Amino acid sequence: MRLFILSLFALLVMFQYDFWFGKNGYLDYQDIKAEIIQRKQENKKLSQRNQTIFAEIQDLKNGIEAIEERARMEHEMIKQNEVFYRIVKNKNR
C-alpha cells in the first residue's frame, strides 16, 4: 500500500512539473497572453493609422482643396497671379 501511495505522489509531482514548466505549460501560457496583449495594441495603432490614411485618400480623390493644400504645404506652390511672402524671424532678437 505504501508503494502505491508513493507511486501516486510521484505521478502527481510529474504532472505538476509538466503543467508548470513543460511545453505549452502555464509559463508558456503567460508569455503568449502577454504577447497577445502587445499585438492587440499594435493592431489598434495600425488600424487608427489606416483609417487616417484612408480618410486622406478619400479627401484627395473627392476634393480639390486637399490637393491644393498639399501642393501649397509640401511643394510651396502658388496659384497664378498670386504672391508668396515668407517671413523669417531675426535670430538676434
Curated annotation (Swiss-Prot):
Its main location: membrane. The chain crosses the membrane at residues 4-21. It is a single-pass type II membrane protein. GO terms for cellular component: cell division site; cell septum; plasma membrane. Residues 22-93 are periplasmic. Keywords: Cell cycle, Cell division, Cell inner membrane, Cell membrane, Coiled coil, Membrane, Transmembrane, Transmembrane helix. InterPro entries: Cell_div_FtsB (IPR023081), FtsL/DivIC (IPR007060). It is found in: Cell inner membrane. Residues 1-3 are cytoplasmic. Residues 28-76 form a coiled coil. One of its GO terms (biological process) is FtsZ-dependent cytokinesis. Belongs to the FtsB family. Part of a complex composed of FtsB, FtsL and FtsQ. Essential cell division protein. May link together the upstream cell division proteins, which are predominantly cytoplasmic, with the downstream cell division proteins, which are predominantly periplasmic. This is Cell division protein FtsB. The lineage of its organism: Bacteria, Pseudomonadati, Pseudomonadota, Gammaproteobacteria, Pasteurellales. The gene is ftsB.
